[in-house]
Amino acid sequence: MILVLDVGNTNIVLGIYNDTKLTAEWRLSTDVLRSADEYGIQVMNLFQQDKLDPTLVEGVIISSVVPNIMYSLEHMIRKYFKINPLVVGPGIKTGINIKYDNPKEVGADRIVNAVAAHEIYKRSLIIIDFGTATTFCAVRENGDYLGGAICPGIKVSSEALFEKAAKLPRVELIKPAYAICKNTISSIQSGIVYGYIGQVRYIVERMKEELQEEGEKEPLVVATGGLAKLISEEAKNVDVINPFLTLEGLRIIYEKNRVKVI
């Protein structure tokens, strides 16, 4: 049994794998002020509520885009699981070739998603991760990670509008029935949701063109992240929604590196 942790700016997603099967999945809020013991108590409670034995965990892997939280999480893993966690970063075997100008700049989450999608789908790829930031990544069929685009997540965009425009309210992120709306709340929802859909459509089509200009076949477009379903279904050019892509990538990377885990 292995424990995988995907640490994002807003949430920490945890998963338990028995071989290749995801048997449990949990979500905690990301808080850099929380101590190792506070995280440890939370995680132990999650194991208890799902009737899982933490002593059966034989390996742990962490991907994080929040450096300031890592001391607490690594200390928690060592104290409560008696394991040195594997951390996604330089020196880790991934099976993909990073063609970024500076490979160290590529976020761990983007690498993990690329590993999972390359392993699962085995073709040219565009990967979209709808998180605090929305990332678009292009991967050749041979596993070359070419780069991509980063933009504010849809929730960040919505919050920025609420915070900077005094008379505009915070709204629920749902798709209105029409683009032409007759009240302020629906009008904001229209602008945010349909505007974001348009952004996704254009970036995907532009990346498809650039990949095909380099000789790649028609890429498969894979989406993941909390708001993938809301945006992808309307964007029309997303082929697959895989909500567990990042967790799968962590499992795959763990298997590639398990001899290094002490």
UniProtKB/Swiss-Prot annotation:
It is an enzyme of class 2 (transferase). It catalyses: (R)-pantothenate + ATP = (R)-4'-phosphopantothenate + ADP + H(+). GO terms for molecular function: ATP binding; metal ion binding; pantothenate kinase activity. Substrate binds at Y100, G107, A108, D109, R110, T184. A monovalent cation. Ammonium or potassium. K(+) binds at D129. It is found in: Cytoplasm. SUPFAM superfamilies: Actin-like ATPase domain. Keywords: ATP-binding, Coenzyme A biosynthesis, Cytoplasm, Kinase, Metal-binding, Nucleotide-binding, Potassium, Transferase. Pathway: Cofactor biosynthesis; coenzyme A biosynthesis; CoA from (R)-pantothenate: step 1/5. One of its GO terms (cellular component) is cytoplasm. The keyword Signal does not apply. Homodimer. PANTHER family: TYPE III PANTOTHENATE KINASE (PTHR34265:SF1). Catalyzes the phosphorylation of pantothenate (Pan), the first step in CoA biosynthesis. This is Type III pantothenate kinase. It comes from Clostridium acetobutylicum (strain ATCC 824 / DSM 792 / JCM 1419 / IAM 19013 / LMG 5710 / NBRC 13948 / NRRL B-527 / VKM B-1787 / 2291 / W).
